[in-house]
Swiss-Prot record:
Belongs to the jacalin lectin family. The gene is JAL10. It comes from the Eukaryota. Gene3D superfamilies: Jacalin-like lectin domain. GO terms for molecular function: carbohydrate binding. Residues 24-165, 168-312 form the Jacalin-type lectin domain. InterPro entries: Jacalin-like_lectin_dom, Jacalin-like_lectin_dom_plant, Jacalin-like_lectin_dom_sf. This is Jacalin-related lectin 10. It holds the Pfam family Jacalin. Residues 1-23 form the signal peptide. Keywords: Lectin, Repeat, Signal. The keyword Signal applies.
Length: 315
């Protein structure tokens, strides 16, 4: 089996009305037959993939896209004959997106099988890849697929993709989900430079976060200031914050659920001391290949809950 990898060096930029690059167009790979088709790059995400297959290979492909929160029903590329239709759904409402596509085509130039990978899962191989040439589209860290193009006639002959920068994703909120007041630093930062944690013998009181944004330091503070304070410095941009671990438990005297301890980890393998008191349910906020670029949570008399925003670590 021959394997071909197609990344950004076989591509062109799609420019929007402001003169900025909206998407990167990856050349279509596969056979030379059929007529060209192009769904364009004016989408926010892909919602669903439809593939019709038969004895000759993939007969057609079709996509549902997302634009401004609504799904768009795109055209069928190819024709429908006797065979079977398989689908692959992307949970775009929960920040899932396609990151790459593996494909297989035969000597006649007919696409035989496709496999889609998202930031959360991988589809089954749709079709039959035996005795074919394999290729890969995408797989670029920090990028997502927002559109497709290619060629098709009586079968699907080739496929290419449009890539754009992937948005930050939001973790679950852990800890006391009803106590205190909500706060949200957002995700519009380049990275985290320093975290200051204030704690007492039984719980976390507050966190103070220094973010970097366009070369400037932006500081956000959440919680109560009384207690012991320690700092954990991240050597951004040479190092990234990648993980927050900790525990949460009920305070017996107050019957409220709060964050009891915190630990931070970086992309260089450094681990902070344990701040606070380890007690109760353990949690880990981490996403492979991603850095933490923002925090949100709840606080009142104590530091009640914490969540983070992830963004891909630059290649």
């Amino acid at each position: 089996m021959v394997i071909i990898y197609i990344f950004l060096f076989l591509s062109s930029a799609i420019i929007d009305s402001t003169g900025l690059a909206k998407a990167q167009k990856l050349d279509a790979i596969g056979g030379k037959g059929g007529k060209q088709w192009d769904d364009g790059a004016d989408h926010d995400n892909v919602a669903k993939v439809y593939i019709r297959g038969g004895l000759e290979g993939i007969q057609y492909i079709k996509f549902d896209y997302v634009k401004d929160g609504k799904t768009i029903d795109a055209s069928i590329h190819g024709v429908s004959g006797s065979g079977f239709t398989q689908t692959f759904e992307i949970d775009y409402q929960n920040s899932e997106y396609i990151v790459s596509v593996d494909g297989y085509y035969d000597k006649s130039g007919t696409m035989q099988a496709l496999e889609f990978k998202t930031n959360l899962k991988t589809s089954e191989v749709i079709g039959y890849p035996k005795g074919t040439t394999k290729f890969s589209l995408g797989g670029v860290n920090g990028k997502m697929v927002i559109g497709f193009h290619g060629s098709a006639g009586k079968v699907l002959n080739s496929i290419g993709a449009y890539l754009t920068t992937a948005p930050p994703t939001k973790s679950q909120l852990v800890g006391g989900l009803t106590g205190g007041e909500p706060w949200d630093d957002g995700s519009n930062y380049d990275g985290v430079k320093k975290i200051s944690v204030t704690y007492i013998s039984t719980l976390i009181r507050s966190i103070n976060v220094d973010y970097e944004k366009d070369g400037q330091v932006v500081t956000r503070y959440h919680g109560m200031k009384n207690g012991d304070t320690e700092e954990f410095v991240i050597d951004y941009p040479n190092e990234y914050l990648i993980s927050v671990e900790g525990t949460y438990n009920i305070l017996p005297d107050d019957n409220v659920l709060v964050i009891r301890s915190l630990i931070f980890k970086t992309s260089k393998g450094r681990i902070s001391p344990t701040y606070g008191f380890v007690s109760g349910t353990k949690f880990v906020l981490e996403s492979q290949g991603n850095a933490i670029v923002g925090f949100y949570g709840r606080d009142g008399g104590a530091f009640d809950a914490i969540g983070v925003y992830f963004s891909p670590i630059p290649s």
